[in-house]
Amino acid sequence: MIRTFFLALVLSLASAAAQSADLQSFGRGSWSKLRAAHDGQPTVVHFWGLTCAPCLVEMPEWGKLRAERPDMRLVMVAADPVPQDPTRVSEMLARADLGKAENWAFTDRFNERLRYEIDPAWAGELPRTLLIDRDGKETVLSGVADLAEVRAWLDTQKTR
């Protein structure tokens, strides 16, 4: 019985560690690196948080959209006002079928600096979605995103 419990515990910890491996640390300079990595590619960047109830409600819908549009460049950024436990962030992403998306989490306690790098006018409201076209032009969706609008934007970008 104890061996079974110990084995289950080890497997559980290994699973959590594997999920966390997909979570990148978002600190100073990460936004410019992220933008450079996706330069010239239509990209959806969704900012969400564990402490944001509307974010948690819409997460499974983002997972469905990603499954529906496997070629879509979707970047999920956990942008809680206070950095959260990476394991909890990874678990939420996995539950929403987003564990294999490009996932980041704010790790700087001075998140105002991170938000300023992204958009000097952003006060930190969540959820927030940026639709970035091939030319780098951003469309900002503040609040729960209308995924029909996101799909329509993806269609204009020829993203499936």
PLM feature spans:
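Boundary at the C-terminal end of the N-terminal hydrophobic targeting segment
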Residues: 16-20
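Bacterial N-terminal signal peptides
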Residues: 4-14
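Aromatic-flanked redox-active Cys/Sec active sites in thiol-based oxidoreductases
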Residues: 46-52
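Loop/turn elements at helix/coil->beta-strand transitions in domains of secreted/extracellular proteins
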Residues: 39-43, 70-73, 99-101
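A short beta-strand-turn-helix
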Residues: 22-43
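Structural microenvironment flanking redox-active thiols in thiol-disulfide oxidoreductases
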Residues: 57-97, 111-113
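Thiol-/selenol-based redox modules, centered on thioredoxin-like
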Residues: 126-160
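Short, internal strand/loop/helix patches
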Residues: 93-126
